[in-house]
């Protein structure tokens, strides 16, 4: 499955103003992720990396839940990364904008979290390996993604939609 990252970046950049107004599914995902994260971590994470922070939907929940000065953000769209940091009072020096598949991550983390981002990876297996190397000894990776049958009804009705991987392809 070929992903055009430039196109993905352009589309998210263009929709950044109206994104939160239309992100009903993403908001539901974030609300379900926090309890999953809490049940997965054994201690309060000191260093947290959010991949694909976008407008900051998950960022705000992570900040509220863990009140962490060790929250680091990544997004493919540089402006979104800095916007999410500013809105959520995260140090701008904690932003790693760009394609996480290509970025060098200089730190290790207790928690790596991502909501609705991994479906955009071009090399998911390599990226999982890379991220696992950036986890502390008891670190946890928690993510959500869209799958092959996401919004199937829209595809059947309109003949259009996005192609996502099935779980075996991740």
Model-derived features with residue positions:
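N-terminal, positively charged/glycine-rich alpha-helical extensions of SAM-dependent methyltransferases
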Residues: 1-17
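A short glycine-rich, Lys/Arg-flanked "PGG" loop and its adjoining helix->strand segment in the class I
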Residues: 125-140
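Conserved catalytic/acceptor-binding region of the Class I
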Residues: 140-170
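Conserved alpha-helix/loop element of class I SAM-dependent methyltransferases that forms part
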Residues: 24-44
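A short SAM/SAH-binding and catalytic strip from SAM-dependent methyltransferases
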Residues: 111-124
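A structural alpha-helix within SAM-dependent methyltransferase catalytic domains
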Residues: 34, 63, 128-132
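A short acidic, Gly/Pro-enriched loop at the edge of an enzyme's catalytic core
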Residues: 101-112
């Amino acid at each position: 499955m070929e992903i055009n990252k430039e196109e993905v970046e352009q589309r998210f950049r263009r929709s950044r103003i109206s994104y939160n107004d239309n992100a009903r599914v993403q908001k539901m995902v974030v609300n379900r992720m926090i309890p999953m994260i809490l049940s997965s971590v054994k201690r309060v994470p000191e260093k947290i990396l959010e991949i694909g922070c976008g407008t900051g939907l998950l960022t705000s929940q992570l900040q509220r839940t863990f009140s962490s000065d060790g929250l680091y953000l990544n997004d493919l769209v540089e402006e979104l990364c800095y916007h999410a940091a500013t809105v959520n009072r995260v140090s701008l020096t904690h932003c790693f904008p760009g394609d996480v598949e290509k970025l060098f991550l200089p730190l290790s983390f207790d928690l790596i979290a991502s909501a609705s981002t991994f479906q955009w990876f071009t090399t998911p297996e390599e990226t999982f390996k890379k991220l696992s190397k950036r986890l502390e000894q008891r670190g946890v990776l928690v993510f959500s993604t869209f799958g092959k049958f996401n919004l199937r009804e829209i595809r059947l009705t309109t003949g259009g939609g996005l192609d996502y991987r099935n779980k075996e392809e991740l």
